[in-house]
Swiss-Prot record:
Keyword list, A-Z: Cell projection, Coiled coil, Cytoplasm, Cytoplasmic vesicle, Golgi apparatus, Phosphoprotein
Keyword check for Lipid biosynthesis: no
Domain of life: Eukaryota
Protein name: C-Jun-amino-terminal kinase-interacting protein 3
UniProt-listed InterPro entries: JIP3/JIP4, JIP_LZII, RH1, RH2, WD40/YVTN_repeat-like_dom_sf, WD40_repeat_dom_sf
Low complexity bias spans: 261-270, 941-952
Species assigned in the record: Rattus norvegicus
Segments for region (Interaction with NTRK2): 459-515
Biased composition annotated in UniProt, kind: Polar residues: 271-282, 914-937
GO molecular function, one term: MAP-kinase scaffold activity
Annotated region described as Leucine zipper-like domain (LZ), given as residue ranges: 424-459
Amino acid sequence: MMEIQMDEGGGVVVYQDDYCSGSVMSERVSGLAGSIYREFERLIHCYDEEVVKELMPLVVNVLENLDSVLSENQEHEVELELLREDNEQLLTQYEREKALRKQAEEKFIEFEDALEQEKKELQIQVEHYEFQTRQLELKAKNYADQISRLEERESEMKKEYNALHQRHTEMIQTYVEHIERSKMQQVGGGGQTESSLPGRSRKERPTSLNVFPLADGMVRAQMGGKLVPAGDHWHLSDLGQLQSSSSYQCPNDEMSESGQSSAAATPSTTGTKSNTPTSSVPSAAVTPLNESLQPLGDYGSVTKNNKRAREKRNSRNMEVQVTQEMRNVSIGMGSSDEWSDVQDIIDSTPELDVCPETRLDRTGSSPTQGIVNKAFGINTDSLYHELSTAGSEVIGDVDEGADLLGEFSGMGKEVGNLLLENSQLLETKNALNVVKNDLIAKVDQLSGEQEVLKGELEAAKQAKVKLENRIKELEEELKRVKSEAVTARREPREEVEDDKIPMAQRRRFTRVEMARVLMERNQYKERLMELQEAVRWTEMIRASREHPSVQEKKKSTIWQFFSRLFSSSSSPPPAKRSYPSVNIHYKSPTTAGFSQRRNHALCQISAGSRPLEFFPDDDCTSSARREQKREQYRQVREHVRNDDGRLQACGWSLPAKYKQLSPNGGQEDTRMKNVPVPVYCRPLVEKDPSTKLWCAAGVNLSGWKPNEEDSSNGPKPAPGRDPLTCDREGEGEPKSTHPSPEKKKAKEVPEADATSSRVWILTSTLTTSKVVIIDANQPGTVVDQFTVCNAHVLCISSIPAASDSDYPPGDMFLDSDVNPEDSGADGVLAGITLVGCATRCNVPRSNCSSRGDTPVLDKGQGDVAATANGKVNPSQSTEEATEATEVPDPGPSESEATTVRPGPLTEHVFTDPAPTQSSSTQPASENGSESDGSIVQPQVEPSGESSATTSSAAPTMWLGAQNGWLYVHSAVANWKKCLHSIKLKDSVLSLVHVKGRVLVALADGTLAIFHRGEDGQWDLSNYHLMDLGHPHHSIRCMAVVDDRVWCGYKNKVHVIQPKTMQIEKSFDAHPRRESQVRQLAWIGDGVWVSIRLDSTLRLYHAHTHQHLQDVDIEPYVSKMLGTGKLGFSFVRITALLIAGNRLWVGTGNGVVISIPLTETVVLHRGQLLGLRANKTSPTSGEGTRPGGIIHVYGDDSSDKTASSFIPYCSMAQAQLCFHGHRDAVKFFVSVPGNVLATLNGSVLDSPSEGPGPAAPAADAEGQKLKNALVLSGGEGYIDFRIGDGEDDETEEGTGDVNQTKPSLSKAERSHIIVWQVSYTPE
C-alpha cells in the first residue's frame, strides 16, 4: 500500500513511486484521480491530514479497481466485436448451407419419387414372373405324372409281351407235334387214300379239322397279322356298342398303345398295331390302324370303294406274310419232300387257298372278310362257307371221320377253350385299362387346362382392376378439366367455391407439390417474421425518440454516491464531451455493421426500467412527449453548434478546406464551391394538416412541340430527338432513374422551357389521394390539384411524347421470332416466362376493332362502354381476361416478317378502359376558382384547343395505385382528365419508360410492358406480362440504364432488355437473401444501389456490373448529429437521387446529405480509386495494384460523353443539410429552374479565400453554370441548428408560450424543401 508523505512545508506527494513502475492509467481514471487529489488537497489545506488519513486508502483501492475494470471492459469489447464478426460469418455460412440443404432435399424428394415408381414397376414384373413360374411348375408336374404312367404302361406291355412270346412258342411246339402226327397218319393211311380218290377228298375235310384243333379257337387277323380269338364276336360287338354309346374318342397314340396291350402277337408281327372296334354294327369286321384313324362319326360315311382299296392292299400284305410263315414252317419240318406232299394236298384242295376273297353275307348288310390263319396256312373262310352252305350229309361225313384222331381231339379242344377264355379275359382287361388310361389322361389334361385358365382368370381380374382404376382416374381428370373449363368461361364473380366441389373431383396433391407448398409457406413465414421485426424495430426507434429517459443511464452508483457525498449543495456544470474522430472505410458488402448497430440500439432501448408507451391516450402524455422531443432536439442543437472543424454555409455543414488534385494538374476542384442554396421551405397544403406525401415527379416535355399538335393524329415527334439521349433537366426530366444534365449534350426546347419546371406531387388523406401540381420556380403557388382515387398512389412517372427513336410496335415480336433457338418455342426467355398479346402489334386499329372478342380502347372519347361478346355491360367499368393461347397465323394484311414461325405460348391480356369521370371532362379553366387567385394556367395550351383533343401521344403522367389501378393523365393540358386506366393484378410499385416502352413493376413479381399503337397513342388493351421468378417477391424499384432497365428483386438486380423482353444479367447486390434492393440511381457508367434497413451505398458498373465502391453514411451522421440521439445511430436510406453533379441521400430520420461526385476518390491510405479514361494521372504507375484503377470506356480522341464517367464519391466531401424532416425523406425530384436572379459566388467562398484575382475567373465560369432545383418531401420540418420549439413560437407570431397548441403543429405537417444548385455540365 502506498502511503502519503508529508514534508515540512505541508506539501503532499502522492503515488510518487507508482508513476515509475506502474502501468499507464486510463484517461478517465486519471481524470478522476486528479479531481480527487485536488479535493483532498483542499481538505488538507482547510482542516488537517487526519481528515483524509483513513479515507485515502479506500479511495485508492476504488480507483485501482476502477482502472482494472475499465481495462477488462475494453478487452471484452474487442472480444465482443470479434465474436460478432464471427457470428455474422457463421450466419452467412448458415444461410448458404440452408439453401444447399433445401436443394438437396428437393433432389432427394425427386429421387425418392423416381425410386418408388421404379420399385412399383419392378414389383409388377416380379408378380408377372411368379405367375409364369407357377404355370410352368404346374405343367412340369403334369408332364411328370404322364411320364410315370407311360413308364408303368410300358412295363406292363413288356410283361404281356413276354407272356405272349412264351405262349406263342408253346403253340409252335404244339403245331409241330400236330404236323408230325399228321405226317405219321398220312404215311400210315396212304394206301387207302390212293385206292379211292373221291373218298379221300371227302375225308380230308374232317381231317383238316382234326389236324388243326385250334382253328376254331385262334384265328389270325387279316389286317394286323396278330392272333385274335375267333369267338370274340360278342366282345367286339359289346365293346363297340359301349364306345359308341359313350361317344368317347381318344387320341391316335393312346388307341394304338391300348391295341398293343389287348392282343397277342407273334415274333413275325413287327411294327403292326391291333385294331380297336369303332362301329356299333354287330359284326366282327375290324379296321386296320396303319391307316389314319377317323373320328367315331366319320366311320358311317366311308364308301365301299375305300374299303375295297384297303382290302386289296391288305390282302397283298397278307400274302407276303403267309408265304414267309410257311417258309419258316417248312424249315421247321426239316424235309422238303415232306413239305412237297403237304403242298400237293393244299394245292389239290381249293378250299385251302391262301388268297382271301371278299364276299357278302346272306343278308347282304355288311361285307365279311376271310380270316386267314397264317400260322397254319388254312383258309378258314372257304371251309366255313362250305360248311354253312352244305347239307346234313357233310356233317355226317365229318362225324364219321372224327374218330381218326380221337385220342388227340379232346386235349386240343380243352386247350382251345382255355386259350379262348384267357384271350377274352385279356381283351376285357385291356379294354378296361384303355378306358381307364384314357380317362386318367383326360382328367390330367383337364386339370392342367383348369389351372392355366385359373391363372389367366386371375391375370384378367388384375388387369380389370387396373383398368377400372385407370378409368376412374381418367373420369376424375375429365371432370376436373370440365370444371376448369366451366370456371374459365364464367365471370370471376360466378366462380364455384371450393366447398361446393365434391371430394372426388378435388385435386390430389403429390409429394412434390406438397413439398413445394411447404417451402412456400416457410418463405411466407420468414417474410412475416422479417416484417414483424422491422415493425418492432421502427417502434423501438420511435420510442427512443419519445422517451429519452430510457436511454439515459449515464452515471453509475459510485458516481451518484460521491456526488451526494461531496456535492450535495449544487451540481457542477456538465463538461464538454469530446467526440473521437471517425474514419471512413470503404469495405466489401457485409451486414456486420447493421447487425452491430441493431444489437447496440436494442441493448440501449431495453435498458429502461419501465415499458415503452407507443400509444399515449391523454393530452398530458402528448405534451410530455413534445417536451421530451424539444429536449432531444436541444441536445442535437448543442452538439451541432459545438462541433468544430467544419464550415457552415447556406444551411449546409461543409467539410474543412479540402483541396483535391485533378488529374491534369494541381488546381483546386471547383465543385466544392457550388453549394445548394435553400430557397423554399413550407408545408405543401396549409388548409389540410393531415395530408401525407407519397411521391412526386417532374414533367418531361422532351420531343414535344405544342404548335404541331393535331387533334386526329396527335403531336408529331421532333425528328432526331431521343428521350433517352436528350438533356433531361433542360427539358423537364425529374426522375432519379433518368440521366442528369452533366452527362448529355444540351438540346434546347424553347417552347417547353416555361413549363418544364412543373412538378406533380401525390398526397393522400385517410380517404382519398390527390395530385398537387406546382411550379418549382414558384413553389408557394399551387397550379392545380385534383382527386385521383380512393387508394394510395405509390408511384408516378413522367412519360415523354412519341419519338422517331422509339421502338416500333412490332419489334417485340420480330426480335423474339428471329432466333428461335435463343428464345425458345415454349415461351420461356432466359428462365423468365414471357406472356404477351395474341394479336400482332403492327395491325392497324381499324383491323383490331373488327374483332368481336377483343375490346377496343377509344383513346379520344370519354363515353366508352365495355363490350364483351358483342353485348354492352355498363355496370362493369373494367374487366380483365387472361387466356393462354398460341399466337395465330398472321393475316394477309400483316407483314411477311411475322410469318417466320408460330409464336411462343403467350398470355393475351386485354382490358376495357374505365369510363371517364364527369368531372374530368370540364376544362381546366373552370377549376380556377378552387385555388388561389395566383394560380398560373399552363402557357403551352392553345386558347382554342378543347379538352377532347388531348392525346396520349403527347407527354403524359402515369400513376400507379396500391389497389392495382394504373392511370394515365396528360402532362400538357386538361390534367384532370384520365386518358387511360387499367386494373392490373397487384399493386403498382414503380414505373419507367424506355423508347416507347413503359415497364410497370407489380407487387407479385411481374412486369407489365406497355407500348404505343400505330397512331402514337398508348395501347393499354394489349400488353405483356413478364415473370421474374418463383416464389414471387415484390419489385421495389427500377432504373433506366442506357437502353436497359435494372430491376431490384429481393437481394438481386435483374438487367432487362425491354425490346426483346429478356433478362440479360442477374447479380446479387447483397449477400443475404432477406435484404431487398430499395433505390437505384444512374449516371454515366455507374449505378448507386441502396438496401433496405442498411446505411451502406453500393456502386456498380453499368456495363460490366462490377462492384466498384461502398460508402457507409452512418458514421458521418453519427458524427454530425451525435450518436444515440433521436435514434440516429440507426440510419436507413429512404430516398436517392443524382442531380447537379451530386448524390442526394435521404435517410429514415429526415437527414438530407449531398455528396459531390468526383472523377477520382482518394482513400484514407492515399490509394487512388478512379480515373478519367481520356486523361493522364500522375499516379498511374500505381494502377496495377488490385483496386487501384477501375477500367472505364473512352479514349483521347473521343468527345466527353457520359459513358466515360464513373460517379465515385467520398464521405470526406459529404455535406449535411441542417434543414431536414422529422420523419423519413419520402422523395427527391430535380427539375430545371432558377429561383435566384443572380447567384453571388462570394457567399459560398471560404473565409480564407480572397476575391481579388479569382473574381474574373469566377464570373467567366458562372456563365457556363447551369441551374437546377431539387425538391425533397417528407413529414414535418426541423432545423438541427435551432431544434424544436423555438421555430414554432416564431411562426406562430406574438403569442403566449404556455397557450394550448393544436394537435398537429405547423412543424409537424408535410413539408417540401427546395434547393437551387449550380453546376458545370460535362
